[in-house]
Structure formats: C-alpha cells, structure tokens
Amino acid sequence: MKQVNRNQSAVAANTPAGLPRWRPRPSLCRRVAWCVAFCVTLFCISSQAQQEQQTAVAPKTLPSAQKIVDSYLKAIGGKKRIATIRDATYEWQILLKDRTLGIAKTQTKTPSSVRSELIFGNGQVVSAANPRSAWTHGLDGKPHTLTDAEAAAARLQAALDAGHLLDIKKSNVLSRVVSFQTAGQAYVVEFSLRSGARLRYLFSTTTKLLVSIEDDARKSITRFEDYRAEGNILEPHRVNIDNGGTGELTFLLQRATYNTGIADSAFDPPRAAEALDVAALLREVSQNQDQLEQRFNEYSFLQRETSREINSKGEVKKETVKEFEVFPIPHREAVMKLLSENGVPLSGERAAKEQKRVEEEFAKAERDKDKNEQKDQKRRAERKRKRAANAKEGDDDDVDVSGFLRVCEFVSPRRERFRDRDAVVFDFRPRPGFKASNRQEDLISKLVGVVWIDPADKQVMRLEARLAEGFKMGGGLLVNLRPGAAFVMEQTRMVEGVWLPRMLQVNLSVKVLLFGGGDYNQTIEWSDYKHFSGDVGDYKLDAPKTPIDPAKKP
C-alpha cells in the first residue's frame, strides 16, 4: 500500500515520572567517569569506522532515475508480471503505538486511480484520486475536493502507485535523482509534474526496494518495510505513515487481491443526495458571461505574471516575474504599465520612459475612440458570421457551453464549501463512445477536469481542465498539444457582487509547425481592482517612483 488517507487523530505524549534525587559517593564518581571516558572512546572509534564505511560505499556518480526504477521493478517481480496487474485491493490492520485502532482498505486501478477507506470506532475516512480530481470524505461526513498543491500531489502519487512506477513517461511524469542518502543507503528520486507537484521516493541501494516516500505538500513521510510475496510480486507488509505531530500510524497487510475488475466509479466522489441539474446551471452561467466581460472593463487592476522554464527532468531552470498596472479601455486592448521585474521596481529613468509610453497610449486611445468602436463592432459582426457559418458546416472552433453539454458527462455533482461560499462541484469527462464532428468537439472530447460553481450568483468559481489525450491540428503539422496540458482558472467575488478573475495557470507542451513551440508554464494573478467607467479620462497615473537601490536596476 502506497496511498492511504492522511487524516489522523492527535495523540498526547505520556510524560515520564520524575526520578528520585541522590548523591553519588566519590569512589562511584571515579568509576562512572572512567566508564564514560571508555564509552566516548569507543563511540568515536565506531563513528569514524562507520563514516569511512559509508564514504566507501557512496557512489561517485549517481545512476539515472530510470535505472533505479528498473532495478526496483526487477526486485519486486519484473516488468512482465507487474504489467498484468490492472487493479489491486489491499486490506490492512491499523495500529497506533501497537494498539489496534481500526481497519483499512486501499484500491488502485491503472492508469491513475487510487482509493483508501479507513474505518475507526468513531467513523470512516475516505479519500481518492482519479484522472480528473482528488477528494476526501472525513469524519464530519462532508466531501471536500482538493485543490492546488495537495490535489497535485495526490494525483501524482495516484499515477505512480496505480502502475507500480511502470511506464511513468506515459503519464507525463518527470523524474530525476536528487541525492544519495548516506544514513539510509538510499537513492532519492524526485518525481514531478510540470504543474509543480513533487514527491521524493527513496530506494535502497542494497535491496533496490522502495523504502520511503516524502511528501512536502501534504507534510507526510511514508515508510515501507517487511516486503513479502503476494501473488507473483513483492509487497510491503508493514507501512508507517507520519503526518508530523499527529501520531504515526502503522498499517499491517492482511490480504491482497489482484484484477478483480474494480469499476471506475469506485474512485468517483460521492454525489449529492438531491438531484442537481448541472446542464441548467451551466446555461445560466453562460448567460452571465457577456455581462461579466462588460463589467470587467470597468476596473483597473494589478497583474502579476510568473513564467517558468522547466527542463525534461522537472527542474525549474529560470523564473521571471513581472508586475503590471492594467487599464482596460472599451473597444481596444488594455493599456499595461510595467511596474517591476523579479520584485525590483523600475529605475527612475526606465520608469519615466514607461510612464511616457503609457501616456502616449492613452492619448492615442482617446484620439481613435470612434474608430476603435467601429472596428470592434465590425470584428464582433464578422466573428458572429463565421461562427454561424462554421456551425452550419459542423466546424465550429469556439469552445462554448453548448459544446460541453454535447460532448461531456458530468460526474458526481455535489455540494461543498469553497472560499467561504457554497459551491456546486462536479467532475467532467467525455461521454463514452463520443465521436467528434468538428475541432471544437475534438478538443473537448480529450479534456477531463472539475468545476466549482456559485449556485447563488451563477458564476464559475474555479475550473480545472487537463488534456487526457494529445490534440492535433492539421495532422500535427500545424499544432500538436501533448497529453497532460493543464489549465486552471479562478474568479473572486467583489464586495459589490461582481465576479472578476483572480488567477490563471497554464502548463503545456506544444509543437507548432513541426519545428516551433516548446514547454510553457505560466501563472497570472489579478488583484487590487479599482472601479472606473473604463474611459481614458477616468484614469490617473502616478508619477514614476525613484528606486530605493539603483544597483538593483532591472
């Protein structure tokens, strides 16, 4: 078992009783001093010998991550045997300090689904991850869909555990050896996704077996011991999970079964007791979209852009952060004023140039106001005409709600709390057997994800979408999006009731026109919204600030 729920009860430490005070005799003091000196000498000698031994066995060069994984697969039974395992069920006894606390059942199914059920005297805790979402159902009986680092780590571990680390590249998992742990004689392999999820797996240099998993996002360390045969492969029969301060739980394997035909629905979140009409809710959300875009042009705001360059091993080679003040203007693109780069404000000279450029942009926007409005109306009419023509020919490229309703099925609609507001949450995936008739449907049919909707305001609170399969245009000659491309968007509710963008994350690997393209990892954050009518005359630019330290001039 490599996936269990992290919710554990805190355990109070026992305080030892005090020892009686006593005064040693002088002769006894000399004997104790001699014994202490002798023990210290032995300790120094043994420590030096141990250090020399460890130094001797420490490799001069670290093997590749793939070689370490291959050795692990060979040690537990070999790739051919592991490849035959489509699903697995493990039954456990749960101990807390050698005291039976409950029982557990964990299940895995390829390519990337896991589920754990922990049953205690006071209730049940269930957690799971599938290709679309990660979720928990705690002792309070309330469902909770994970987000951000916790969700990413859960989905990454599900992809690794469900396949026993076999063919991790097909799951778009990156791997690299980060260190050699001398104390435990283990190689530390970091597995990661381009979205930022990271887990460290420790493999013994002697047995080649997995001995530990370190998870910083969920603040847990899982240790594996007592490997014995179950069927045709080796499985750990003792697993210790330490969540840091909440008491370490021990899981003892009682039974393991394979290929019993576990249904995909076993890994879906529990749906709400009442019927939720997701299609009707999405149509209402769509009707609010035009109004939302119009209101968005009434606010200036700060925009923070973070771009990362990630290599094939998952290492962040370069990170660039830029912050802008943005002034939306009707019927044309917004005016963006650069404020800082990598946390350093623009210098006086450069800030003055940027201020001048922005003022010239405002002046141009004011001069061309009527012309821009006419161009915008013409663009809208042309776009509407093309959409109608493409829809008639069955080749509409615009992704809209009607397309999602045709292509997707909505899984486990449920009610949760999100950002201190009520939310309707549901997973989405392509309808089984759906055949796309245009590029829009082709793209949607390859997406999976999860959506949070505010049922009162009929607004999307959060949207996560990932490409389960690659997407190509022109047979891959024009555009080739690789599987695993991910998109996350969030909106926030202002005091006056309008919803505005809060965050956007894009992670994708794309090839354009055979030779162009690359890997893109970007996060955009919006904040400090200020309401204006959107006219140029309403904006007031602050004078450029003198930098604190000219040496930090970007």
Label the predicted regions:
Residues 51-184, 195, 261-262, 270-447, ...:
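Structured extracytoplasmic
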Residues 42-54:
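Signal peptide processing junction and immediate N-terminal pro/mature segment
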Residues 143, 219-269:
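Extended, hydrophobic interaction surfaces within ordered domains
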Residues 116, 213, 237-242, 463, ...:
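Beta-strand-dense domains in secreted/periplasmic systems and polymorphic toxin scaffolds
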Residues 179-215:
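A mid-sequence, solvent-exposed acidic-amphipathic segment
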Residues 127-130, 179-182, 201-206, 221-232, ...:
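Aromatic-rich beta-strand edge motifs centered on tyrosine
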Residues 33-44:
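Bacterial N-terminal signal peptides
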Residues 1-29:
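N-terminal secretory signal peptides that target proteins for export/translocation
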